[in-house]
């Protein structure tokens, strides 16, 4: 009886260690049949999607735009890239405080990030309203390369 119990425990441990894919975590993209990474993220399709959006947004700063585009072209999962969000996309903006050379606000981002996989549409969709923190630079017209480097470092920590 003890032997049967040990066999059952070993079998359950082995089953827990097997990689199991759900349709959402398929190994292959339903669009191009290429390999996917985290939760069905297809690097090829998502890179093409983001490239197609490049002409439709700009931060107004060449260095910031290049940084955002770099993260989008090198993303390996849905929450691994930066995105330019126009100020008009935020509601309920509330001042929190200031320090150094910036001010911090809380706000509601009405669209939210692209984090939800829609099985029917077979594409990533936005979450809807989500609370976020905004940082406003006091001298944002003259963003330095050291500030861009700081953004790069913060992105690597995410």
Where are these regions (language model features)?
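Intrinsically disordered, low-complexity regulatory segments of kinases
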Residues: 1-158
């Amino acid at each position: 009886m003890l032997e049967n119990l040990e066999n059952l425990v070993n079998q359950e441990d082995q089953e827990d260690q097997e990689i199991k894919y759900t349709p959402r975590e398929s190994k292959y993209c339903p669009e191009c049949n290429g390999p996917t990474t985290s939760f069905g993220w297809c690097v090829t399709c998502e890179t093409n999607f983001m490239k197609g959006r490049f002409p439709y947004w700009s931060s107004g700063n060449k260095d910031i735009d290049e940084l955002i585009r770099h993260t989008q072209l090198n993303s390996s999962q849905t929450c691994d890239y930066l995105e330019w969000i126009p100020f008009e996309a935020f509601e309920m903006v509330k001042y929190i405080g200031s320090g150094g050379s910036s001010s911090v606000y809380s706000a509601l981002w009405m669209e939210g990030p692209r984090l939800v996989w829609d099985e029917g549409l077979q594409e990533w969709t936005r979450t809807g309203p989500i609370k976020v923190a905004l940082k406003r630079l006091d001298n944002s017209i003259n963003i330095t390369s050291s500030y861009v480097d700081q953004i790069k470092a913060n992105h690597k920590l995410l």
